[in-house]
Amino acid sequence: MQTPKRRRGAQGCPRSSPSPPLLLLVRAVWFCAALSVAAGSFELTILHTNDVHARVEQTSRDSGKCTGQDCYGGVARRATKIRELRAKHRHVLLLDAGDQYQGTVWFNFFKGREVVKFMNSLRYDAMALGNHEFDNGLAGLLDPLLKHANFPILSANIRPKGSIASNISGYILPYKIINVGSEKVGIIGYTTKETPVLSNPGPYLEFRDEVEELQNHANKLTTLGVNKIIALGHSGFSEDQRIARKVKGVDVVVGGHTNTFLYTGSPPSTEVAAGNYPFMVQSDDGRQVPVVQAYAFGKYLGYLNVIFDDKGNVIKSSGNPILLNKDISEDQDIKAEVNKMKIQLHNYSSQEIGKTIVYLNGTTQACRFHECNLGNLICDAVIYNNVRHPDDNEWNHVSMCIVNGGGIRSPIDERTNNGTITLEELTAVLPFGGTFDLLQIKGSALKQAFEHSVHRHGEGMGELLQVSGIKVVYDLSRKPGSRVLSLNVLCTECRVPTYVPLEKEKTYKLLLPSFLAAGGDGYHMLKGDSSNHSSGNLDISIVGDYIKRMGKVFPAVEGRMIFSAGTLFQAQLFLTWGLCVSLLYFIL
């Protein structure tokens, strides 16, 4: 922070009385310093959440169902910390960067009413739309969220087309100017332009380039005399950084979508930091722009303090996400409202399906980066559901299943309730209500799909394919588009099923989520037409029936997906290089 000039800081200082001189001198110095800061700067505290995904109740360490003592998050605990920080700081904004919808039985049952109720109760100041806010179509966004929220809902890069424009006019705003004390703060929203392939917004919404639209509205705000601008949105950490670099006038970026954990210092829980908090980006016009996210699932509350000079420039930013653990009590009024709504859920969510005797790893860190045993279980269940009577040529008509890692939304802990799996827990794993469909596809297109699976591996996106009836070997040291070293599939025209090399010109049958069959997550090569695509059963019904039939499940990680020695060598090389640089730094 820049030190104010002495003459300016001295203006208006009271004269000291002779008695008692020391006490009065201290008070005078304190008062003058406070006056100096107030005259030349403005401090803003930004509390923020992103990717909460219907975690109304407190959760386990890995954001599944919590029944023990080691619990995190939940709206009641968040309310306590927000109230505390509002009392501590004078100028506070509470913001959400999207994806409040979808993820637990709460959303499946209440369809977003729970989101509106508790966001209103916590008095959010603004929210940006995430892709999952469109999971129930535009109608499911309009009512309840858009019609009943007591706070502005923002996205500058969504443009309605045709008659739909009049239906949502005034509900989705590009920006909002909020009076904070004597200052005006502009907040511009943005939503990932990948939303049409990630969710269900329908054909009448256009998702434009984030940077271009943000710049247009930042220019408008500047013209209106607003010199403190926050970009609040849901496009992922890489896009957040691009916005910070490219958009003139944006002072702070509050993001979401990639569940990015940023932290300065030693992390307080199991999440590994992707960088410091705030993550500082130098803009193309030479400014330092803080970029923040707060992981996901309401486990943390983002906590950023920003000091602006009198021209609206950021001169200091600091903070860290606050871990909402058991040391923070739950607000009893909010807790009572949660329990009241929970009564309606009980019969729906408490149905017992079966048991697991192993941890079903459905975490982001597992299923989006490598083979996960919950992905194996899901696809094995889908194959089992499609076993038919053999004939003279085939033991079964289909042997292969894929599911995108981003479609697996929660783990199931075998140490909770003696391994009992309830409908609530299974709904948290597969919350989207999709089907597993049958597709006929050429081997060349399937190979292309597996290249797409790892084209940006390591960024935590949801495209990585979990499989059954397929064995794939990747080399991430190669360029995207040429990373599949081998792809073997389980034969069907055989008496003893074995894995054989994929034939590019052969047509195969493949089981996959309806989301992927519609081209979701960028899998345009899987998008089928009515001649080669047959709709199947509900995903949660398929997996639930399989678990019921098995009674107890214990899926393993089996080497269905392998990253080659070349990839491992590259990782070791980067690690060694990083250690050498660190060692050299300390030596010098």
UniProtKB/Swiss-Prot annotation:
Membrane topology, record value: Lipid-anchor; GPI-anchor
Gene3D superfamilies: 3.60.21.10, 5'-Nucleotidase, C-terminal domain (3.90.780.10)
GO CC terms, sorted: plasma membrane; side of membrane
Protein's name according to its UniProt entry: Snake venom 5'-nucleotidase
Matching CDD domains: MPP_CD73_N (cd07409)
Pfam family, one: Metallophos
Binding annotation for Zn(2+) 2: 51, 99, 131, 234, 257
Entry PTM: Venom 5'-nucleotidases (or a part thereof) may be released into the venom via exosome-like vesicles. They may be attached via a GPI anchor to the membrane of these vesicles. Soluble forms of 5'-nucleotidase might be released by cleavage of the ectodomain in the exosome-like vesicles or venom gland cells.
Family: Belongs to the 5'-nucleotidase family.
Record field: catalytic activity: a ribonucleoside 5'-phosphate + H2O = a ribonucleoside + phosphate
Enzyme superclass (EC): hydrolase
Keyword Glycoprotein (UniProt): yes
Species of the source: Crotalus adamanteus
Signal peptide: 1-40
EC number: 3.1.3.5
Pro-peptide positions on chain: 565-588
GO molecular function (one): metal ion binding
Subcellular locations according to the entry: Membrane
Glycosites: 167, 347, 361, 418, 532
UniProt-annotated binding residues for Zn(2+) 1: 51, 53, 99
Signal listed as a keyword: yes
Function of the molecule: Hydrolyzes nucleotides into nucleosides. Snake venom 5'-nucleotidases are widely distributed among venomous snake taxa, but there is a lack of information about their biological activities. They have been shown to inhibit platelet aggregation. This effect may be due to the liberation of inhibitory AMP or adenosine by its action on ADP released upon initiation of aggregation. Venom 5'-nucleotidases are also known to synergistically act in vivo with other toxins like ADPases, phospholipases, and disintegrins to exert a more pronounced anti-coagulant effect.
PROSITE patterns reported for this sequence: 5_NUCLEOTIDASE_1 (PS00785), 5_NUCLEOTIDASE_2 (PS00786)
GO term, biological process aspect, one: AMP catabolic process
